[in-house]
Every structure is written in structure tokens, then in C-alpha cells.
Amino acid sequence: MKLTQYYLPTLKEAPKDADTISAKLMLRAGLIRKTASGIYEWLPLGLKVLKKVEQIVREEMDAAGAHEVWLPLIQPKELWEESGRWTYYGKELLRIKDRKGAEFCFAPTAEEVITDVVRRDVTSYKQLPVALYQFASKFRDEIRPRFGVMRAREFYMKDAYSFHATEESINEWYLKFFEAYKKVCTRCGFKFKAVEADTGAIGGNFSHEFMVLADTGENEIADCDCGYAANTEKAEIFKPKFPAAKEELKTIEKVNTPNATTIEDVAKMLGQTADRFIKLLVFTADGQPVVALMRGDHELNEHKLKALLKAQELEKANEETYAKVTGSFVGYAGPVGLKEKNPKIKLFADYHVAGIVNGIAGGNEKDVHIINVTPSRDFTPDVYADLKIASEGDLCGKCGKKFNFTRGIEVGHTFKLGTKYSQSMKAEFLDENQKSHPFLMGCYGIGISRIVAAAIEQSHDENGIIWPAPLAPFDIYLVSIDTDINPKVKEETDSIYNQLTQAGLNVLLDDRNERPGIKFKDADLIGLPHRIVISSRTVETGEYEYKQRTSKEAIRRKLADISEQIKEFQASK
């Protein structure tokens, strides 16, 4: 492809609202343009990469035994009401009405419609298992779209679903998709890790995320030498053992803390550290208030609390609910005496709260805190559990060794859904005894557009993108210099271009009438694996200049040996 005939608008500077490396480079390199908040156009160069990812994923899905379908983006309210998600999916679900007033949504996922497809046609265990997949644009009305195409409102993904009669069957197919995703990540040239994950809005009872490792990743991964790995939303922490208290238990005492509503403010006022505090948080779980207690320097993991409560929805309580539950103000509520005021309320405490001796808590009145608070003596939680987000120093819940922490970008997610959707939607089959059962289901999503961004986050330098060879939109960036003053340059360039393309290599020929510096900058920005330069200086010596994108220096090679170079290119694809 000649650049003079190709639509490739590059930019010297990234737009100011581009907030990640991948967003900046995708915009500058002409892969995408922004239409609206969280919505992007994919230009020819970006689309070539997207289609390469799509083909890799398609090949692995086919190899796993799944079959491709095409499902509607616009889905009727009635299907989502059957699953219950019309109500609890929340504002991220974009809802619309047609001219007759019928309600629909722009699908962020496809569990409902695929379950409807299968329940209409699959009635017997003899027809199982079934595995179907699709590539489709999805829409999720993110409250704050960010990170370019990684957290966009409109995105492109592959989602697959499997239906089974037995637990053995779903386990077998879950492993098939798990291995297929590992192959996808390997073929894309990624350094990656598969980690245990929370099931989130999809639901189910078991899931893994496939993380592309990158320092700029939005997800933190807790990783142990024993082989256990999970994102910090899911990571199980070893239950701490607390030695007998060395300090003498002191009598609780109220202290004035005027206008000090944060742990930081009170700690400074009292000359204490955050780990001495008992933090009280109020939530509503499926509409019912609950109280969580954390050590002051720890962050509550809402996913763990939600799972513990087996709640569909968990939200932070508003000020009115907070006051009703605690009888106090935000920043001043504490566990001491709370059960006496509100006997029906349940206290859920993280394990680490049990280790606090002579701690500090809210005094349940304005501008007052209580010091010398000790759990079990001054209050008793209903439940102790692992409720914290894993952080530096925490021990692995499987073996007790210290976690290592890395960052990653989620590109794929696999779920064992069980009967979450089939039961609520009455999707059933008959077994060999003519007894009816809900399908056991699996769900397997992979973000095609996210993979493109993740590749850039993992592989780039100060000059631009460094594409892994399997994802590169072209194999070679061929640069011609001095064609206007030296006919020999054009002759040799055309010859090499023809030889490369006839060998099945994809070549982008920069034949623009631009300065060499501009061409070289664009070559680095676009990030193709190989660069060849033909100029007056090289043809004089019967040579061409060759540079790998990952190398700092270019080397000279003989034009007569181009056939050997072609073999190297073919081997590296």
C-alpha cells in the first residue's frame, strides 16, 4: 500500500483529553478519532489491527468447538425482565423506546438473548453441549468514560456462551475456553496472567480474568509463589492471627474532635496513626441497611461484602439512611453502643478489626470520638470475614506466603454462570428420564478493541507504538528518499516493494514528498516491526538501510541479498 493513496492522518500532538499512553498513541498514529465521550471511529490503520485480533480469536473459538452467530444489539425489555437485570443492571444500561412505545436496550452483554435462542430450539440432553459465539459492538453507558477505547461506552468484543447438562460437561468446556484464551494472548504476543476474579454484574459462581501485564494497567493483581493469582477485588487474604495484647486495656473515654470528620483529621489531632482506628461504613444491600467495620488504614472491598451478603445490589447509604442507622453524623459514627440503639442492624467486621486494642472510633455524636475502644469488650460484630482489598504486606489466603503485586489490563473474562440465567428464564432441557432441568451455562468474553489498546500499553517507547508482529497492521514500513532527484531510488524502491508484496508481505510504502525526518518519525509512531530505507546514498553503494522497530540503530545490507531479508521477514510473521 502506498501512503499517498492511503488514509492515514497522523498528529504531532495528542489531544489534551487523551488520558492514557494508548489513547494518545492511537489518536496520534491515526488508528482512531473521537466522535463523542466514550465513542470512537476506527480508521483504516486501526481497523486492520482490530480485524487481525478478531481473526486470531475466531480461529481459537472455532478450534475449541464453538460456532459463530450474529445476535441483535437492540434487545427487548421483556428478556431483561425475565433475568431480573432490567431492574438491577443500573444506569449503565441504555434504554430506548421505538415508535410504538415498546422498550428496548442497547446490549452491554448478551446472556438474555442467547439463552432465549437456545431455549427455543434445544430441548433434550442429547442436543448438549452447545457453544455459540459472536463478534459485536456493545454499549455500556459509563458514568465517566476514560482510558480511550479501554473504558469506552461503545466497544467491540467477542462473547461466547456454552450450555450443558452436567457439571462435568461445563467444567470440561470451561477449561477449553480457558486454554483458548491463553492461546489468544500468546498469539497476540502478550506477557499475561490468568487470575481469579469477581463475577460482577454478569453473575455466576466462578470466573477468571486474563490480564495483559502493564505498569499502566488499571487493575492490580495479587500474585503468590504458590501459583494463586487474583485481582485485588477477589484476592483471598490469609486470616491473621493476633497475639495476646501486650498493652493494658484502658477504659473507653470520649474526646472532643471539633470539625474532624476524616481519619486523617482525627489522627493528626490526637497524634495517632490510621491503623488505630475502627472505620464504620453504612451500605444498603438490596435495599436493607448493613454496617461494615474496617481498620482505619484498610480499604473495604465492596465485592467481598456483596458476596458475603449474597446481595444483587450494594450501594453506599445516603446521609438520611446513615443517620437513621447510626443516629449520628457522617464521620462521627462508631460501633460502641450501636446495637443498643438499633438492635436489628448487623455489624460485619473485617478480620483485622479483631486485632485492634485501645483503638479509636466515632463517638456517635457530633465533634466527638471515643478512644481506648477494644472489640469484644466494647462491641461485638455479628460476623468477622475477609472484607479488605488486598494490599502490600498481605498474605496469600491459600498458603500464607506474602503476596507480590503487579498491574494489568483485563482483556478477557470467563465465567461459570451455573443456572443464574437459565433458571430465571425457564430455559430447560429433558434428561434421559424425561425430567426437566435448567441448563448449566458458561460465559466467555474477550475485548477485541481493548486488546488493541492493551498491546500498545504493554509495547511502546517514547517515539510511538511497537506492534507485536501478529498484530501489526503492516509488516514493513518502506521509505523512499530523493525520488524526485534520483530515478535510481524510485527504480530500486519499486523493485523491493514488488518483491516484498509478491512474497506475501504487507508493505506500507511511504512515497510522500516529505522530509526524511517526518517519514522516520511517522514510521516510529506507527510502529511497524521493520523499516527499510532506500535513498541516493544507499543506492550508490548498492545497499538499503534496515532497522527493526525494537532496535536503536539501523544497519546497511546489500540490495542483491534482499531475498535473504525476505525469508527473515516471513519467518518472523
Swiss-Prot record:
Enzyme class, top EC level, equals: ligase
Gene Ontology CC, one term? cytosol
Q: Which catalysed reactions does the entry list for this protein?
A: tRNA(Pro) + L-proline + ATP = L-prolyl-tRNA(Pro) + AMP + diphosphate
Cited HAMAP family: Pro_tRNA_synth_type1 (MF_01569)
**Per its database record, what is this protein's job?**
Catalyzes the attachment of proline to tRNA(Pro) in a two-step reaction: proline is first activated by ATP to form Pro-AMP and then transferred to the acceptor end of tRNA(Pro). As ProRS can inadvertently accommodate and process non-cognate amino acids such as alanine and cysteine, to avoid such errors it has two additional distinct editing activities against alanine. One activity is designated as 'pretransfer' editing and involves the tRNA(Pro)-independent hydrolysis of activated Ala-AMP.
Q: What would be one Pfam family of this protein?
A: tRNA-synt_2b
Quaternary structure? Homodimer.
User: What's one GO MF term for it?
Assistant: ATP binding
Is this entry keyworded GTP-binding? no
Source organism per UniProt: Elusimicrobium minutum (strain Pei191)
User: What is the protein named?
Assistant: Proline--tRNA ligase
Q: What is known of its domains?
A: Consists of three domains: the N-terminal catalytic domain, the editing domain and the C-terminal anticodon-binding domain.
What protein family does this chain belong to?
Belongs to the class-II aminoacyl-tRNA synthetase family. ProS type 1 subfamily.
Provide one Gene Ontology biological process annotation: prolyl-tRNA aminoacylation
Per its UniProt record, what SUPFAM superfamilies does this chain match?
Class II aaRS ABD-related, Class II aaRS and biotin synthetases, YbaK/ProRS associated domain
NCBIfam families assigned to the protein according to its UniProt record, in alphabetical order = PRK09194.1 (NF006625), proS_fam_II (TIGR00409)
Q: InterPro entries, from UniProt?
A: aa-tRNA-synt_IIb, aa-tRNA-synth_II, aa-tRNA-synth_II/BPL/LPL, Anticodon-bd, Anticodon-bd_dom_sf, Pro-tRNA-ligase_IIa, Pro-tRNA-synth_IIa_bac-type, Pro-tRNA-Synthase_IIa_type1
Q: Which UniProt keywords apply?
A: Aminoacyl-tRNA synthetase, ATP-binding, Cytoplasm, Ligase, Nucleotide-binding, Protein biosynthesis
Its chief place of residence is cytoplasm
Task: Give the UniProt subcellular location, in the record's own words.
Answer: Cytoplasm
Tell me which EC number(s) this protein carries: 6.1.1.15
